[in-house]
């Protein structure tokens, strides 16, 4: 647990600025903008017929909790929030599947990754992920872990393009009983 706490301290070293794009820790004044990006993501998933994020979660209380836990991050372009993600050094659901992941105590988990609809298909999502990967590398993180719905073909292709390795199906503990709980797990070795 000490390693995970240390990593959370390391994660707090953001912001990471590149030109007019910045990855930084979110604050409570940004909840409305973050929820707008998440709402865009929910609508996008609904249009694709994907039963993920459709029944309340992630909601405002999730983002508020992420901010309190210092795990909520935003991606800004010229001061405008164009993306959001929850970055953490631990995931209890992932720990239930020790045989699918590479054995390691120093990993970063990405959840609630979303890009504002006006910025999709413009390379922002790819740049966002590259900056998260660069940040992980600079902080000696060994692996990045993420999961997505099996029907989310766009994100699955996105993860493959970013060199994530598809592992296996996992089942998440989700608050609501209406969203599908099965996800495909992915992992990226930071080199």
Region spans (language model):
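Conserved acyl-donor/pantetheine-binding loop and adjacent beta-alpha core of acyl/acetyltransferases
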Residues: 86-112, 120, 174
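A short beta-loop-alpha structural element at the N-terminal edge
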Residues: 22-36
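Conserved catalytic-core motifs of GNAT/GCN5-like acyltransferases
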Residues: 147, 160-182
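Conserved beta-hairpin
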Residues: 71-85
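Conserved GNAT acetyl-CoA-binding A-motif
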Residues: 129, 136-148
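Conserved active-site alpha-helix within GNAT-family acetyltransferase domains
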Residues: 126, 138, 151-168
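Conserved acetyl-CoA-binding loop-helix of GNAT-fold acetyltransferases
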Residues: 115, 121-134, 157-161
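Conserved GNAT-fold acetyl-CoA-binding loop/helix
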Residues: 42-64
């Amino acid at each position: 647990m000490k390693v995970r706490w240390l990593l959370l301290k390391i994660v707090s070293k953001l912001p990471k600025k590149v030109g007019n794009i910045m990855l930084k820790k979110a604050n409570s004044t940004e909840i409305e903008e973050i929820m707008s990006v998440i709402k865009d993501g929910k609508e996008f998933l609904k249009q694709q017929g994907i039963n993920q994020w459709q029944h309340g979660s992630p909601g405002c209380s999730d983002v508020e909790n992420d901010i309190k836990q210092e795990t909520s991050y935003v991606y800004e372009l010229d001061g405008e929030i164009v993306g959001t993600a929850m970055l953490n050094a631990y995931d209890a659901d992932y720990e239930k599947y020790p045989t699918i992941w590479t054995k390691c105590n120093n990993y970063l988990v990405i959840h609630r990754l979303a890009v504002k609809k006006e910025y999709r298909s413009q390379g922002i999502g790819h740049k966002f992920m590259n900056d998260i990967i660069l940040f992980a590398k600079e902080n000696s993180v060994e692996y990045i872990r993420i999961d997505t719905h099996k029907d989310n073909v766009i994100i699955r292709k996105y993860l493959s393009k970013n060199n994530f390795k598809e592992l296996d199906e996992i089942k998440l503990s989700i608050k609501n009983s209406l969203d599908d709980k099965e996800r495909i797990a992915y992992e990226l070795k930071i080199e």
